[in-house]
Amino acid sequence: MEGWQRAFVLHSRPWSETSLMLDVFTEESGRVRLVAKGARSKRSNLKGALQPFTPLLVRFGGRGEVKTLRSAEAVSLALPLSGITLYSGLYVNELISRVLEHETRFSELFFDYLHCIQALAGATDSPEPALRRFELALLGHLGYGVDFLHCAGSGDSVDDTMTYRYREEKGFIASIVIDNTTFTGRHLRALSEREFPDQDTLRAAKRFTRIALKPYLGGKPLKSRELFRQFVPKR
C-alpha cells in the first residue's frame, strides 16, 4: 500500500537502536504494523510526529505482516489530551489494538475514532459519553448487531418501565429479575440513540459495552483500564 492515507499511531515501542515498531490505525488499510526505520535517530524528523493522537498522512509498503513506513507527515498538532482524557484515549487505542484484525479495512470506524478523540480533546466534563459512543460504534462495525428497541422473545417494542435481560446472540428478553445483565426499556432507548442524558443511562451503557466486548478481549485485562482506575476513584 504505497499511496498516502490518513492514520493515527496507536502504540509505539523501540525497535533496534534507531527504529520504532508502530501499531497504526489507517483509513484504508485498517490496523497495520509498521517499522519506522531511523525514527529514533537524532537527525530524524519523524520522532515528534509519530505520537498517539497526532493526525497523520502515511505511506508504507513491503510484504508480510510488518510493513515499512516510507513517509509520514503530521496533518496538525496532536489533539490535546491530558489527565482523564489522556487515559481515556489510551483506552480507546488499546481497544482497537486488541479487537481489530490486521489489515482489515474499517473506514467508517476510522472516522468514529477521529470523532471520539476530538470529543475527548474538547471535553469539559466527563469523557464517558464519548467512550460509550465509540464502544457501541466499534461493536457495530464488528458485526455485533443488537436490536435495542424490540424484545427478542415477542418482537414487541420495549417499554421504558419494563426490565429486559441481555442474552448474547439473541438480544433482550423481558425479565422480572434484576441483576447486572438486565436493563430498563429507558436504558435500551438511550443505547439505541447513543445519547446518555444522566448518570443512570451512562452506567447502563458501560455495563452493556463491558458485557458485549468481553468475548473479543478474552481473559487478558486492558492495561489502560487499570491505569484509568488508578487515576480516577471508583464511583
Curated annotation (Swiss-Prot):
What is the name attached to this protein's record? DNA repair protein RecO
Q: Which PANTHER family match?
A: DNA REPAIR PROTEIN RECO
Domain of life of the native organism = Bacteria
Signal peptide interval? none
Q: Which family does it belong to?
A: Belongs to the RecO family.
Q: Name one Pfam family in it.
A: RecO_N
Query: Per the database entry, which stretches of residues form a coiled coil?
Result: none
NCBIfam families membership: reco
The record ties this protein, via SUPFAM superfamilies, to: ArfGap/RecO-like zinc finger, Nucleic acid-binding proteins
Swiss-Prot/TrEMBL keywords = DNA damage, DNA recombination, DNA repair
Task: Kindly state one GO CC term assigned in the UniProt record.
Answer: bacterial nucleoid
| UniProt entry tagged with the keyword DNA repair | yes
- Name the InterPro entries for this protein: ARFGAP/RecO, DNA_rep/recomb_RecO_N, NA-bd_OB-fold, RecO, RecO_C
Q: Which GO terms describe its biological process?
A: DNA recombination; double-strand break repair
Q: What does this protein do?
A: Involved in DNA repair and RecF pathway recombination.
